[in-house]
Amino acid sequence: AAGLISDAEMANILQQAEINTGGHSKIASVIPQWFNLPHQINATLPSILGDDTAHVLARAVQFFLPGEPQVYYVGLFNGKDDQDFFAKTKQGRDVNRHHYSPAEIDEAIASPVTQAILGLARLRTHAAFDGTFNWKQLTDSTMELQWTGKDSKLKLWFDLSGSTPAFSIKITDGTSSRSLTSLSELATI
């Protein structure tokens, strides 16, 4: 994170992750001898965020930013830290390497979070993503990410001020548009 955020901001993120994971992320994360902070947080994003809407919003931001979004299978399945696997191997990264049974995969794929993330993946093929990207920070807690194509536009608006974040994805094709504001609506894409 060097250069992207300050050490103080990173320490705050690590502290919040520790709180949200009941202290487990601190145990699983390794602090290199040459630095005072871990180089990565060994915990799953769903465990760190502790909220399904926050997790899907983080994925929406990821999908709206330029580049090729990548989602690890545990994140797609909304997987929480596998503390049992970590306890067995003592390898910090193993908290994010759950071995899913076929029944667990079926359950995860049917979940609202996974269906919403799959909807975002389908949306990423929209023609507007071949256009121009821009973003605006509206307030300390609200932002818009937007793609504008020849005949289409996609806009992600979100607000982080509440205990649960709010978001809206507006899809405009020609003269028609629709807005999606929930996980279940994202699943319909």
Descriptions of predicted regions:
Residues 1-189:
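Active-site and adjacent substrate-binding regions of carbohydrate-active enzymes
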